[in-house]
Amino acid sequence: MWSLFAAAAGRTSTIRLGPEVTNVVLKDPTLIAQQAATLDELTGGRAELVFSTGNFALLQQYGIDLKGTKPIARLREAHRVMTTFLAEGSIDFDGDYYSYSGLFTAARPVQAPFPIKLGGMRGPRSFELAGEIADGLHTALAYSREALDFTAEAFRRGADRAGRDWTQLDLANNMLGAIAEDEAPAREAALVVAAFYLSSMPPELLERNGVDPQEVAPAMEAFTRGDVRRALELAPPSVGEALSVAGTPQAWIDKIERELIPAGFGHLLVTFVDPFLVQSWAGISIDGLPTLEEQLRLFQREVMSAVAS
């Protein structure tokens, strides 16, 4: 993904670029720091670095089991490594998870200090850690007011504990969804891809979004077996409603103004579900679903302008 954003650097001028998120278990923090510094130079100071351990289901596919290995301590250590390497260009460090002796780099970022943000979904400890040490928290798939409040409150606790002003940090939420003038295809598409995310969502997050883990267990088991079509058949329609924002521009405006902003979030990240994504993931087509470009333009024209005003 870093290569993709590097390619986009010369074709953009204002948008900030970076993967959401980069995994510090699968990739060494010093390598991540060098990629971030290089992208920052290519973009003239527009690089984003959001790091995480990734979800446990993904790591298991790589044969890695993090249970019982103190992932929060790993995140804290990775943050220290990246902060030092980006600021000084060299590092000597002997930690529990990472060790370096005389390591240096010529890759230097434009932004100083370089902002480093933490990605987290389960919480609350990762949310608190972000408030304590990072420049922000990027969470994902928090749709209900309960889920949003839970995240924001834990983030604030961490900031308060460290004597930091949480309002000066970047609190963001990545929401999955689709936008269209006709809400029917948008809702159908969102259900398809929301079902795919079930296996990556911890039970606690499902419950905070009003989803009973037992109710969706059959669909999750089908996904684990690789039976996508059966999983989609077993996923109840309520999953699409609870785990996405889908419909007309007004539906998006309502979600942002009534829930996201009041909970304290100042940054929205959106993963739009387009025909290509539905076809590649589920092997189906949905009549009337706008393309990605059409959804982006509709969102910019109708939603961003309304919220900004």
Q: At which residue positions do the language-model features occur?
A:
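Active-site-adjacent structural elements that line small-molecule/cofactor binding pockets in enzymes
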Residues: 1-309
